[in-house]
Design a protein with these regions (language model features):
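Rossmann-like NAD(P)(H) cofactor-binding subdomain of soluble oxidoreductases
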Residues: 74-126
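NAD(P)+-binding Rossmann beta1-loop-alpha1 motif at the extreme N-terminus of oxidoreductases
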Residues: 1-51, 55
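Internal alpha-helical scaffold of NAD(P)-dependent oxidoreductase catalytic cores
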Residues: 130-214
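N-terminal Rossmann-like NAD(P) cofactor-binding module of classical short-chain dehydrogenase/reductase
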Residues: 60-61, 87
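Interdomain hinge/lid region at the active-site interface
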Residues: 200-270
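Short beta->alpha hinge that forms the Motif I/post-I loop of the SAM-binding pocket
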Residues: 31, 64, 89
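Alpha-helix C-terminal capping/helix-to-coil transition sites in glycosyltransferase folds
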Residues: 55-56, 135
Length: 277
C-alpha cells in the first residue's frame, strides 16, 4: 500500500511511523522542510507527496488544522483522482466536511471525515510514535452511512494503525460530543492552572492536580481554531458547567451542608451512571 500524509506533526507523524513499521510506502508533505527532511532521515517517510504522486496513493491522510485541510484539498483536489481514499484527521468536522464533501464530488475522489481519538500533551514529529493509535477509537464521518463496501475498505486501509474500534457518525453529532469530551476539558484545565496558588503546589499535590492540569499543556493556535469553529456547542457546555459551579458556590456561601452533600452526591451518582464503578 502507498500512503500519503499531509502534515507531519504528532498525528501525521504517528501515522507515518505506524505504516512504515507495517511495511508500507509512505509519501508525505509538510510546510516545514526541516520536519520533512527529519522524517525522511528517520526512515518513516520514503519520499515527497507531490501533485504528481497523489493519484498513486491508496490512502491519503490529512493531518493539519481544519482550515488548512480545506485549503489543501481545494488546491490539490483536481490531482487526486479516483484511486485514493482521503480522510482528514481534524478535531472538528462540520467546517471540514461541509467544504470537502462537495470538493470530492466535484473532483471525483473519495473523502471521509475522520478523527483519531488519541494524542498526548506534546506536539510535533519528534513525539510521534508508531503505537499512538493502538486500541484507540477512530471516528468516521462518511457522506453515505449506508456505503458498507466503502466503510469496510476504510477499516482495512486503517488496519496498520491499530485502532481498537470505529464509530460512524455525522459531523454535527461529532462536534457536539467533542465539545464535551475533549474541548471543555481543555478549557477547564487551562483556566484551572491560572490560579495564583498553582505556583505553590509542589508538596501539596498528587493525582487530582495531575489529572486536572495534564491537558493545560496544549498547542494554543490549534486549540483556539478548534474552539472557535465549534463555539456553539462549546459555549453551551461552558454555560452548563458555570451554572453547576454556581450551585456549589451558593451552597458554600450559605453554609448549606445538606445542599452541598446533595450536589456532590448527584455528581457521584452521575459518574456511576455514565461510566460505572
Amino acid at each position: 500500500m502507498t500512503v500519503g500524509i499531509v502534515g507531519l506533526g504528532l498525528i501525521g507523524g504517528s501515522f507515518a511511523k505506524a505504516y512504515h513499521e507495517a511495511g508500507h510506502r509512505v509519501l508525505a508533505f509538510d510546510t516545514d522542510q526541516s520536519v520533512f527532511d527529519f522524517a525522511v532521515l528517520s526512515g518513516a517517510v520514503d519520499g515527497l507527496l507531490s501533485e504528481e504522486s497523489l493519484s498513486s496513493c491508496d490512502l491519503i491522510l490529512i493531518a493539519i488544522y481544519p482550515s488548512a485541510a480545506v485549503d489543501y484539498l481545494r488546491q490539490h483536489g483536481a490531482h487526486i483522482g479516483p484511486k485514493p481514499v482521503v480522510i482528514d484527521c481534524c478535531g472538528t468536522k462540520r467546517l471540514v466536511c461541509d467544504a470537502c464533501f462537495p470538493l470530492a464530488k466535484e473532483y471525483g475522489f473519495t473523502y471521509l471525515g475522520g478523527h483519531p481519538m488519541a494524542g498526548t500533551h506534546n506536539s510535533g514529529f519528534k513525539y510521534a510514535t508508531p503505537t499512538m493509535f493502538h486500541n484507540a477509537p477512530m471516528v468516521l464521518v462518511p457522506a453515505d452511512h449506508n456505503d458498507i463496501d466503502l466503510l469496510s475498505r476504510v477499516k482495512e486501509l486503517l488496519a496498520p494503525a491499530g485502532f481498537g474500534r470505529f464509530s460512524i457518525t455525522t459531523a454535527e453529532q461529532h462536534d457536539e460530543m467533542i465539545a464535551f469530551t475533549s474541548q471543555l476539558a481543555h478549557v477547564v484545565s487551562n483556566a484551572y492552572i491560572k490560579s495564583p496558588t498553582a505556583g505553590l503546589h509542589k508538596g501539596f499535590s498528587a493525582g487530582s492536580y495531575k489529572d486536572m492540569t495534564r491537558v493545560a499543556w496544549l498547542a494554543p493556535e490549534m486549540w483556539a481554531e478548534l474552539f472557535l469553529e465549534n463555539k456553539d456547542f462549546l459555549m453551551a457546555e461552558l454555560d452548563t458547567l458555570m451554572a453547576n459551579l454556581r450551585q456549589y458556590q451558593d451552597a458554600m456561601v450559605h453554609n448549606d451542608l445538606p445542599g452541598l452533600v446533595r450536589l456532590l452526591d448527584e455528581g457521584r451518582k452521575r459518574k456511576e451512571e455514565v461510566d460505572g464503578r
